Amino acid sequence: MNIFEHSIKNVDKGNVVAIVGTQWGDEGKGKIIDILSKYSDITCRFNGGGNAGHTICVGDKKHALHLLPCGVLYENNINILGNCMVIHLKTLMKEINNLGNNILDRIYISEKAHILFDIHQEIDAIQEIRKSKDGNAIGTTKKGIGPCYSTKASRIGIRMGSLRNFENFKKLYIKLIDNLMDLYNIKDYNKEEELNEFYTYHLIFKDKIINIISYINKSIDSKKYILIEGANAAMLDIDLGTYPFVTSSSTTLGGIFSGLGIHHKKLNLVVGVVKSYLTRVGSGPFLTEQCNEIGEYLTKKGFEYGTTTKRPRRCGWLDLPMIFYVKYINCIDIINLTKLDVLSGLKEIYICIDYKNKTTGELLERGNYPLEYEQLREYEPVYEKFEGWDEDITNCIEFYELPENAKKYVLAIESYIKTPIVWIGVGPTRNNTITRKFD
């Protein structure tokens, strides 16, 4: 379905569509972004860095993308790295070289995005070691994301635009690195080698670094189809997520407007991606986590290992109070439900439909969410039980082909969150997707 030219229920079509994760990441956003990129003219990343990981399966081939938008897989697509990204150019070059086919011709980078240096990754590792000694490790990807955003917030970071003038960049670089080496007592760091690398990046990228605000707004006004790709997910938002167990950028709807320089009235449609169960990487509260054979089953069958870190993900039942909250802050119009096939083979499946206060027995108001760890500990999940199914559903191409119990599960989710579920993932590839019709 070409979502840019197709209205669904009370949701009007439009030329600017955003895809956002509704949980703790790893919902399978990459697949729906890949499907919709076929119809878009421009695909944009607005936040984060190499800590994101989108795995796209095209036939027998897997593409793991960390910085590049998923639109790079389509030759008709221009791909933009936005203002609020932090970009490790060594990682970006590796992705570009792995994909080949003149990918660089279709990439533009915001002059306002910040450069992530190797020293940021060293600092990330140092900070995690220090926190782990106190039992307070966040479980970061150690990709340098937090330290890079820290230098940005401290106003000593270096933007991509500075790389266009290498002599000026060199002065800024030496000042920054000397500052960080002194601050973190780093004795050995090869500045000369990294500067040589960055001279190469200067030659490669100097004409690809642009004012994306002007570019995107002109494209929107000329009715180009714009697909906006969220990295990480809502519950990892630096302000609105389960702080401090979050990422370092704004992952929710508000991040789009600063990350791309567009105003809210230009955004037509928001697609929320919901995994059929729940996963989390690293530390942090997780009320529906299954530390048992169910959790192990979901990890193995769902191949729940981080695209970036390769760490096994923690697994549990779908948490609807989380979705109610995320729907409020993201104004979600339609849903893509992913990885329904992973639940095949379970005798019973549970959905958390409410949070109940352990002391008072009161149910949490829907749309509210206890983000602080101490608050969350006051609640326990209230489950609704569903009968499972044994059938392999990976070859289902229409909703009616699903087993009755699978259909009941999907319709129950849709009923609770009062948002149409348009796409249902039933396997890893583009073709393993059911598109429901609402005409």
From Swiss-Prot:
- In what pathway does it function? Purine metabolism; AMP biosynthesis via de novo pathway; AMP from IMP: step 1/2
Quick one: signal sequence residues? none
Question: For this UniProt entry, what is the primary localization, expressed as one broad class?
Answer: cytoplasm
BP-aspect Gene Ontology terms = 'de novo' AMP biosynthetic process; IMP metabolic process
Q: Where in the cell?
A: Cytoplasm
Subunit structure as annotated in this protein's UniProt entry: Homodimer.
Q: What does this protein do?
A: Plays an important role in the salvage pathway for purine nucleotide biosynthesis. Catalyzes the first commited step in the biosynthesis of AMP from IMP.
- What protein is this chain from? Adenylosuccinate synthetase
Which species is this record about? Plasmodium berghei (strain Anka)
Gene name tied to this protein: ADSS
